[in-house]
Amino acid sequence: MNKENVITLDNPVKRGEQVIEQVTLMKPSAGTLRGVSLAAVANSEVDALIKVLPRMTAPMLTEQEVAALELPDLVALAGKVVGFLVAELGAVTFPKNLSVDDLMADVAVIFHWPPSELYPMSLTELITWREKALRRSGNTNE
């Protein structure tokens, strides 16, 4: 795993006898970001981070542990999450109401793919397939 994706927590997470001092972030896939707005993740909204960080951290933090993080630790983790999005998509502005679920639904409806085919896709792949789905459906206004 890339050492750049490792965050040393200023205030370690205590889980019973275990003390988590470092957290490794994994590059998110479409499945990782399901159920949240891309704009919310890109803007580091706390509710979105509480949802996605447990899906992309090792050791896996719980939603309760993420919610209890000290601000400097949450900001450090959020910076890595946003870094993944910027590296993957560039300077893309997401409409407030656009979610990964919306992208997946557009692709699934047109191409009849099950979610299991879509979850492993990167955001770039998912957006590319959504554009193809919109063109195929004749809806190019989005």
Curated annotation (Swiss-Prot):
What gene does the UniProt entry assign to this protein? E'
Q: Which domain of life is it from?
A: Viruses
Stated name of the protein: Tail assembly protein E'
Family annotation (InterPro entries): P2_GpE (IPR009493), Phage_tail_E/E (IPR019289)
Species this protein is from: Escherichia phage P2
Q: Which UniProt keywords apply?
A: Late protein, Viral release from host cell, Viral tail assembly
Function, as annotated: Promotes tail assembly by creating a scaffold for the tail tube proteins. Tail assembly proteins E and E' would wrap the linear tape measure protein to create a tail assembly scaffold.
Q: Which residues form a coiled coil?
A: none
Gene Ontology biological-process entries: viral tail assembly; viral translational frameshifting
Family as reported in the entry's similarity comment: Belongs to the mulikevirus tail assembly protein family.
